[in-house]
Amino acid sequence: MGIQTAAANDVAQHTPMMQQYLRIKADHPGTLVFYRMGDFYELFFEDAEKAARLLDLTLTQRGASAGNPIKMAGVPHHAVEQYLAKLVKLGESVAICEQIGDPATSKGPVERKVVRVVTPGTLTDAALLSDKSDVYLLAMCVAHNRRGVATSVGLAWLNLASGALRLAEVAPDQVAAALERIRPAEILVADTPSDSASWTPPVNAGALTRVPVWHFDVTSGTQRLCDQLEVAGLDGFGAHSLTCACGAAGALLLYAAATQGQQLRHVRSLKVEYESEYIGLDPATRRNLELTETLRGTESPTLCSLLDTCCTTMGSRLLRHWLHHPPRESAVAQARQQAIGALLDAPPGASIDSLRGALRQISDIERITGRLALLSARPRDLSSLRDTFIALPELRTQVAAVAPNADSLARIDASLEPPQACVELLKRAVAQEPSAMVRDGGVIARGYDAELDELRDISENCGQFLIDLETRERARTGIGNLRVEYNKVHGFYIEVTRGQTDKVPDDYRRRQTLKNAERYITPELKTFEDKALSAQERALARERSLYDALLQALLPFIPDCQRVASALAELDLLAAFGERARALDWVAPTFSANAGIEIEQGRHPVVEAQVEQFIANDCSLTPERKLLLITGPNMGGKSTFMRQTALIALLAYVGSYVPARRAAFGPIDRIFTRIGAADDLAGGRSTFMVEMTEAAAILNDATPQSLVLMDEIGRGTSTFDGLALAWAIARHLLAHNGCHTLFATHYFELTQLPAEFPQAANVHLSAVEHGHGIVFLHAVSEGPANQSYGLQVAQLAGVPNAVIRAARKHLAHLEQQSAAQPAPQLDLFATPMPMLLEDADDERDAKAEPAVPPAMQELVERLRGIDPNDLRPREALDLLYELHELAAAPDADH
């Protein structure tokens, strides 16, 4: 048992300060406690050991309590954010314990309390947040039937930095997909065995926090949600029937409020998400399409990194949300594209470049508003909010010029009206360039508060006051050598030499007698002294009081600030889409109620940006042509063609323009991808198991409105098993699912599928042999491929020439066997060739790939080691015989 745990069992044995600490720690088990002591936050006992290990701090021992040494580690208060950021990234939570009592008047330890708890899912400080991605806290409530089997999962997730709260209910088998979409930083679950057994968090899920099961009570959760939203019922939000989600929301709100130590004033709206509202993207699809993260785990190059030319961080965060939530309803996409078109066609005075220039003056008022609601906004947050509001009229003028051409822009224009009372208050109250922290002063503007101005004047103009007083007193008394001075012992005084003391007025009171002078103080100087000696301290205290009152006065404007922030984010993202469309030569797609996908000269948006020249391709999927069998060599571009089709479709439904000459889309409900695979070591699944699991999900869930990408299904097992599975899966997709499918394969036998199913068609990506190498054309053509070029690709990859030669010989042998035994050619595209061609092939290979046999290699090495200038005639003759024998060796006969 650790000292901290043991010590807590008998608090009375400890020193008063340790008693205080242990009581606070007992209320926050499992959380690191940052205990404020002067200019440091200290950690004790096991917390100190853990923090020292995680943060690379020095672990010390100072004194003892209850007979045990006190282990300590500390961080300076002015740098606490950087340490909090490290701990949060490691999934730790930290309770911030501040001194709230006055050390000067406290008897015993200064009173302290936890003012907030920083957890991975409840971040609001700018220093702890990523500018371009949101942080979500999610709670999960699981409903069970009488047999204890999970039947439904309620989800509630909150972006505390903005106040956005959302609910959803999903089937238990859809939880992983929901978490992949939301990407919560922290997940709250009930601390009951039934919930723990019914759900296993994915490997990349956020930090898991267990809370008491009663937090998820549906009745109290529903009431807590109504109280938070200030409504009598949830019917207006469409959440009245989501009992499980309401239970999750109750636990989430209780936890979030506890971490902040106050109400969540900015959480006043609710959005219910339904599966039918968005195009379904399972975890594999989100990864394979590399929307916001590459397969290597980096943020670039991705679709998001290509599109993100936003001028504000609010727009960048909205972009990520839109990419992961493409709406199924084409009307949403069409409204966004209409707005993009209006921005691109704007008159010169309201051009998209001019608009984006104005947007660059905008601050992240979404997060500023969140901190304002939590009363944690800093002075520069308020000045940024003020400056943003001041910049809005110019921005609105430009938006108003194009608003008549797009309903979305008209709505945005109306939402950009700032709350004038808030603007005026900020202009009057906040200094033009305030200090970073209130404690530094210089935050409240001059003229806002007369008392503060007077205190500042006293503090700043003390010297001038003394000069003015000295001048006046000399004139009043006629004492020419009178001096007004100050020292730390006696304070302010008027000094008069002994020879002039008879001229001292009656209101002078003697303060000190010196050998040659008398020192006096007057009522006026005493009053000034009282003010001056405490002016700076009182000014800072007054400023703190005024600042706190200002934050309270700004609270009623939070809904207006949120409205403006939301409009700015949407405007910024639409303008970024317009800039990308113009710069990258993208076009507006069209939509139809008829099923199908028609893309003319489509391009992969991300790959195109990485290469000098990209080959555009067409893609046509119709009710009469539902499945394209794609064949061709490795590296020929099959996967790129498939991914670009899915990305163009997703971009269209997000509302962006698309990389194509023309594009038209029918309804799409889900996008599935089965592209590539790797072992799931953590889940105990092989590559083939992962592949089959993804294929099963597609076969079970794809509908006639789904877009499916299948890349080389069946390759992870034996040739016959793989071919049989690939054939059966393709047939099932055609006959039962009826979905739009791009099916890439190396099984040449599958190219016979269109003979059985007219809805299938063959296309291929071609390549040509050039000299001794291969050139990939990356062009999609009708019909099946006739060669795989596998050996040429292996050669390009650097496989040793000896291995390539051996492969060619074995390939010819297999082809001869295939010709002798009439059976399907498996996995190979090449026409069977007789063994008689082996020698000719080898001769050609030798010319194409000048391999060096072992004997020849020895000969070459021997020659390299000889210097002819050093050989005597006899040595040269002996060497000649030696080299002749080497050259005559069997392996050198080439």
Curated annotation (Swiss-Prot):
Q: Could you tell me what this protein does?
A: This protein is involved in the repair of mismatches in DNA. It is possible that it carries out the mismatch recognition step. This protein has a weak ATPase activity.
Q: What is this protein called?
A: DNA mismatch repair protein MutS
Against SMART domains, the record matches this protein to:
MUTSac (SM00534), MUTSd (SM00533)
Q: Which NCBIfam families match?
A: mutS1 (TIGR01070), PRK05399.1 (NF003810)
Identify the PANTHER family for this entry. DNA MISMATCH REPAIR PROTEIN MSH1, MITOCHONDRIAL, DNA MISMATCH REPAIR PROTEIN MUTS FAMILY MEMBER
Entry-linked PROSITE patterns: DNA_MISMATCH_REPAIR_2 (PS00486)
A GO term from the CC aspect: cytosol
Q: Does the keyword Membrane apply?
A: no
InterPro entries, per this entry?
A: DNA_mismatch_repair_MutS, DNA_mismatch_repair_MutS-lik_N, DNA_mismatch_repair_MutS/MSH, DNA_mismatch_repair_MutS_C, DNA_mismatch_repair_MutS_clamp, DNA_mismatch_repair_MutS_core, DNA_mismatch_repair_MutS_N, DNA_mismatch_repair_MutS_sf
Task: State the species of origin.
Answer: Paraburkholderia phytofirmans (strain DSM 17436 / LMG 22146 / PsJN)
Q: Gene encoding this chain?
A: mutS
Record-stated family: Belongs to the DNA mismatch repair MutS family.
Which SUPFAM superfamilies did the record assign?
DNA repair protein MutS, domain I, DNA repair protein MutS, domain II, DNA repair protein MutS, domain III, P-loop containing nucleoside triphosphate hydrolases
* Molecular function GO terms recorded: ATP binding; ATP-dependent DNA damage sensor activity; damaged DNA binding; mismatched DNA binding
The entry's ATP-binding residues are G632, P633, N634, M635, G636, G637, K638, S639
Q: Which GO terms describe its biological process?
A: mismatch repair
Classify the source by domain of life.
Bacteria
Alphabetically sorted, this entry's keywords are: ATP-binding, DNA damage, DNA repair, DNA-binding, Nucleotide-binding
